[in-house]
């Protein structure tokens, strides 16, 4: 019975990857017939939209992903020679979105990873155990695109801060906690995704500038939520600031974007990792004054300036 359930779940997922139609019938899966000899044609956007329609029914989502996890665990524990491909292919790293379509896309590992792309990080520990791999190369955006995307960045920043204060060994920080039930090695993944936070506890302005919209949003939320919750009067205030920053990055000039990136950089380096000082505060305020003289600040930049001054005043 268990085997038939697994096969049913796998068939269902296969149908999604082959862009087949599907229906839900009292908790069972109805698969339409279609020749998929060409393999899976995985489209992250299409898959996400299809799953999103039924995402409110988390029981179904967990059911077939858990079935895959059980099957992988069984594969690792039992006869590996029954596999139609090498067990080593289960551990092939995928470092970015483009590699979801690499030449090994037909393997069970790729199918497993493509589904993991949509899963809440709370399940990572189960999958990591099922694969029996302590260095599972899970892409950082697998964490970033989940229901609670800020956990990975928040905890990573927290660990960097502790390391700066307590001089923890690098190996001791190999595994970071994303939430109460998740253990994922995200340092390598964050480093691989344009190095949001390098190990020296600083943020690089150019790297912030190069982040995509969602990476920047998550980084800001992590910094605000973890380090500046005592300054912000409410979540609405934080959300308003983030909204203004988003407007700058979407509609502002290149100068506006670089300037805002610089403020974000200062928020982290001077006031968190390096601790604020009068010299640092004066330096950033002088640059703000220089910026105001040369160009009229857009409203979003002014909001950031006001927030920064408020934080500086609090720190002093």
From Swiss-Prot:
Keywords of this entry: Glycoprotein, Signal, Sporulation
Segments forming a coiled coil: none
Entry keyword Glycoprotein: yes
Signal sequence annotation: 1-18
Glycosylation sites: 19, 251
Gene Ontology biological process terms, A to Z: sporulation resulting in formation of a cellular spore
Main location per the UniProt record: other
Compartments it resides in: Spore, Perispore
Keyword Lipoprotein: no
Name of the protein in question: Spore wall protein 30
């Amino acid at each position: 019975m268990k085997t038939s359930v697994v096969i049913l779940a796998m068939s269902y997922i296969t149908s999604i990857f082959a862009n087949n139609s599907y229906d839900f019938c009292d908790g069972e899966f109805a698969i339409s017939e279609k020749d998929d000899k060409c393999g899976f044609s995985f489209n992250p956007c299409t898959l996400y939209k299809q799953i999103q329609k039924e995402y409110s029914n988390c029981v179904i989502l967990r059911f077939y992903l858990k079935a895959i996890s059980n099957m992988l665990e069984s594969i690792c524990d039992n006869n590996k020679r029954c596999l139609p491909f090498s067990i080593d292919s289960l551990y092939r790293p995928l470092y970015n979105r483009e590699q979801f379509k690499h030449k090994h896309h037909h393997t069970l590992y790729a199918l497993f990873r493509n589904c993991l792309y949509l899963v809440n990080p709370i399940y990572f520990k189960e999958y990591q155990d099922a694969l029996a791999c302590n260095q599972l190369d899970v892409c950082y955006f697998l964490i970033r695109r989940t229901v609670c995307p800020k956990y990975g960045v928040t905890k990573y920043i927290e660990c960097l801060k502790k390391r700066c204060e307590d001089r923890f060994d690098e190996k001791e920080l190999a595994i970071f906690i994303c939430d109460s039930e998740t253990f994922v090695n995200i340092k390598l993944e964050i480093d691989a995704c344009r190095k949001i936070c390098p190990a020296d506890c600083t943020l690089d302005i150019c790297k912030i500038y190069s982040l995509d919209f969602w990476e920047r949003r998550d980084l800001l939320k992590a910094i605000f939520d973890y380090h500046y919750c005592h300054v912000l009067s409410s979540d609405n205030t934080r959300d308003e600031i983030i909204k203004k920053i988003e407007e700058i990055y979407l509609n502002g000039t290149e100068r506006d974007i670089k300037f805002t990136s610089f403020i974000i950089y200062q928020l982290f380096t001077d006031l968190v990792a390096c601790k604020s000082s009068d010299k640092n505060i004066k330096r950033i305020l002088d640059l703000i004054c220089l910026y105001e003289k040369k160009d009229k600040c857009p409203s979003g930049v002014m909001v950031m300036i006001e927030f920064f001054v408020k934080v500086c005043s609090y720190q002093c």
